[in-house]
Every structure is written in C-alpha cells, then in structure tokens.
C-alpha cells in the first residue's frame, strides 16, 4: 500500500460514445481519437509524477472493459470500472474505496483539461499536508481535479453537475463543513469545437512552465465590490501567482476570484491567519500581501523584485494613494507615506513584499 493515490477518470474512446459535442467539428471517429489522445496526455503527466514519488496510479473508466483499457494504456496501472449513478456518486465511491484501504492522500483528475501538468499534480499532493480539500477549477465552472485526505460524502451530493456552479458550490459546501480548502491553477477544458485551439496549443508543449516570480496573497471577506479591480491590477503582469484567502464571504468574492484565475483558499476570518495560510501555499520566492480593495501600480512586480535584490533590503512597500478628492484624504496619504519612509512602518494598505525565505524564518504574522 502506498500513502498517496492518484485516480484518473476516463472513458474508453469508442466512436459515437465519447466527446459527442465535438463530433460536429471532428466527426465521430475524430472525436474518439481526440478522447484517446487527451487521456494519454493526462496519463503521461500522472506517470511522470509516479516516477518521482511513491504514488499509486489507478484508472477508473466508463465503456470498454479492464482488458481493453489495459491493451490501450498498458500495464502497471490498476483499472476499475466507475461505480454509481451521476458523476458525484462515481467520485464519492472512488474516494471511499481509496480511503478505506488506508491511503492518506487521494487526488482524482479528469482528462478534459490538457493544461494539466506534473507540477499541478505534485502541488495538489503537497497541499494536502496542510489542507482538507484541494480543487482544480475549470474555466466552465466545473473542476478537473479534487484531492481529499478524509471521506467527505457531502461534497459530492446536491451539486448541480454539468453547470457553471459546480466548483463554487463545492467550495461553499467545504466552508460550511469547516474544511480548509485551496485551489490550484484554473484550466480550460476541451468540450466544444471552439475549445479545440486549447488542445492544439497544449499538445504542442513539451516542457513545463517555469515557476512564478512572485506570489500575491489577498485576504478577503465580502470584497465583491472591489476585488475585480484589485485582481485586474495584479493579473496584467506575467509570472504572478495570485492566492485569494477567503474568510467565509457571503457575497460573490470566491466566484470572482476563480473567474480571474486566482487560487482560492478558505479559512477562518482573521487577517493574520489568512495571510499566513496564503504564504504557506505560495510557490514563488517572493511574497506580496495585498488588501482586497487595493490596486497595484503598473510594473509593481519588477520594481519590488529590483528592490529586494538590492543590498540591505529585507522588505518593502509602495506609496499610499487614496482614491477620491479632498484635503483629508491627501493628509492621510502624506502621513502614511511619511511614516513608512521615516520610521519604516508601512500600513497593510501599502502592499507589503518580502522574500518567502525571510517571512518563514520570521515565523509569519503574529496571530493577534
């Protein structure tokens, strides 16, 4: 028995019974061939992960038989027919069986998102050391990956499968159950003819993308009004990992974060704990902590990285500018900027940045 298990959900590529929504563009034979290629693509990522860590690999299939699946995908895998009615029941049963036999971390992935990488799979297993639920959201509102370390049957029930609410509803249920949840990369799934360029682009990539230069951590609680503008200011720069740590918002904060491609964590509504949780999940060498109602200036990442590379610079922040007219706001700006310049005591609104190594050595933010 291995402590980690990776389950790949797939379907035997039988013409006329798979990828039917793509048949109008590819024909039934072409749609089946695409299903075959996408499953092989996803499985190659899974096998690459198994080559570097002791992960048990399983394929849970629909259509065909275990023998036909083995002829297609080869030996060295455990093949199981999917059991249950709807997708939720089939996933619930797969997790129940895996966790019943003693696995400590179980990740289940589909094969519809060609952007899946070994890095994402590795990250999912690593995050399960600190979180109860890991979710890989898809652009259409569903998810391509889910990871658990305990049985949580309610996560697969009362879900409107096949709608744009699947991922957000799952995260809402997780919050209600008191689970610590985190998302990995937002990916695009290939279900319709207009999605085919995504497959063509991803299938042509032979290497993995490099790591992000900076992780921006945004603690939130009901920030629907401001969050979209905040995320727009962050995501216009390349190689930035965006992590929204939500404290249980009752508005559309989580939905907006996912729509913008941010990773989403859920935890208790306490700012220091939220920022520490985001820092723990971050993968970049530099951390930037940003309030949900604050916008960053153009070129923020380059300037921050340049300053941190300088001798004697441990951390930094930006000048404060408050939106709106009036001498009172200008006075607040002036006092805040003077305080940070002269006393080296910036406010959180000024977007604090620091190397991840130094932040972790310092023990993070105090739990006040």
Predicted regions and their residues:
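Short aromatic/hydrophobic "clamp" motif used to bind/position activated sugar donors
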Residues: 106, 287
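Acidic donor-binding/catalytic loop of UDP-sugar-dependent glycosyltransferases
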Residues: 111-126, 252, 272, 292-306
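Acidic helix N-cap motif at the loop->helix transition within catalytic regions
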Residues: 67-70, 225-229, 251-260
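Conserved donor NDP-sugar-binding/catalytic core segment of glycosyltransferases
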Residues: 127-133, 298-328
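Cell-envelope/extracellular polymer assembly enzymes that use nucleotide-activated donors
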Residues: 5, 213-215, 241
């Amino acid at each position: 028995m291995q402590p980690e298990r990776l389950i790949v959900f797939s379907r035997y590529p039988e013409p006329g019974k798979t990828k039917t929504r793509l048949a109008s563009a590819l024909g039934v034979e072409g749609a089946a061939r695409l299903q075959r290629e996408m499953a092989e693509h996803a499985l190659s990522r899974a096998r690459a992960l198994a080559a570097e860590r002791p992960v048990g690999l399983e394929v849970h299939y629909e259509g065909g038989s275990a023998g036909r699946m083995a002829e297609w995908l080869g030996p060295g895998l455990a093949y199981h027919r999917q059991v249950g009615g709807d997708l939720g029941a089939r996933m619930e049963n797969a997790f129940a069986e895996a966790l019943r036999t003693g696995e400590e971390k179980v990740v289940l992935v589909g094969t519809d998102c060609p952007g899946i990488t070994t890095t994402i799979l590795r990250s999912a297993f690593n995050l399960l050391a600190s979180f109860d639920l890991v979710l890989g959201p898809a652009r259409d509102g569903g998810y391509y990956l889910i990871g658990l370390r305990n049985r949580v049957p309610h996560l697969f029930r009362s879900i409107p499968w096949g709608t744009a609410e699947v991922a957000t509803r799952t995260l809402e249920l997780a919050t209600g159950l008191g689970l610590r949840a985190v998302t990995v990369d937002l990916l695009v799934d290939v279900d319709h003819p207009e999605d085919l360029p995504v497959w063509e682009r991803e299938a042509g990539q032979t290497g993995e993308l490099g790591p992000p230069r900076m992780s921006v951590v945004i603690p939130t609680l009901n920030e629907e009004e401001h969050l979209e503008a905040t995320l727009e200011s962050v995501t216009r720069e390349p190689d930035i990992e965006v992590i929204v740590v939500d404290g249980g918002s009752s508005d559309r904060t989580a939905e907006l974060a996912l729509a913008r491609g941010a990773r989403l964590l859920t935890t208790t509504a306490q700012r220091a704990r939220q920022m520490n949780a985001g820092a723990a999940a971050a993968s970049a060498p530099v951390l930037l902590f940003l309030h949900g109602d604050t916008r960053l200036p153009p070129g923020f990442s380059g300037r921050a990285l340049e300053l941190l590379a300088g001798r004697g610079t441990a951390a930094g922040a930006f000048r404060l500018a408050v939106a709106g007219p009036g001498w009172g706001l200008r006075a607040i700006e002036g006092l805040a900027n003077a305080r940070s310049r002269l006393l080296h005591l910036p406010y959180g609104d000024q977007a604090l940045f620091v190397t991840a190594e130094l932040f972790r050595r310092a023990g993070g933010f105090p739990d006040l």
